[in-house]
Amino acid sequence: TADDYVIYIDTDSIFASAVPLVQKRFPNQELTETMMTQRIMEICGEVQDYLNKSYDYFAKKFCNIDKHVFDIKQEVIAKSGLFITKKRYGLRIINDAGRKVNKIHVKGLDTIRSNFAVAMKDLLQNVLDDILADVPKEKIDERISVFKRNMTSLHYDVMANPIGVKGIGKYQVKDAESVF
């Protein structure tokens, strides 16, 4: 719905849009990226405290235990994200554990797979960077078109899948004149 904040949930993670919460809490304010990050951290701190106190209550009331080890904490603030499927996403992180950063975090996408062609990984990483930087679609399409036009001039080492055959040295050609 229009009021949904949660974007992605996994076993131990939740990604939510804090922008609607900030806009509701601080209406009619023009916020710089730094101010927006500070406001998000304030709200995250409140949510974190509330959830952790709820776990204290839950542990005592429903499990009859005084102490539990479950602890919620805010880890990153991302300016943008691309969520494909479960455990496959990319984030442009601007704050990591309270430190200002500008980095891309990738989970499960082909840009980090070791058995994916280097040229394709580079292209996909550049396209992901463009998407997360809100580059217009036309410019991204042009990047892909240029890559496709230049593919035939790329060396096979960067176009081939970087895989090997285990124990290939034990296979030898018996007849030097025979192709097979």
What are these regions (language model features)?
Residues 1-11, 18-180:
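DNA-dependent DNA polymerase catalytic subunits
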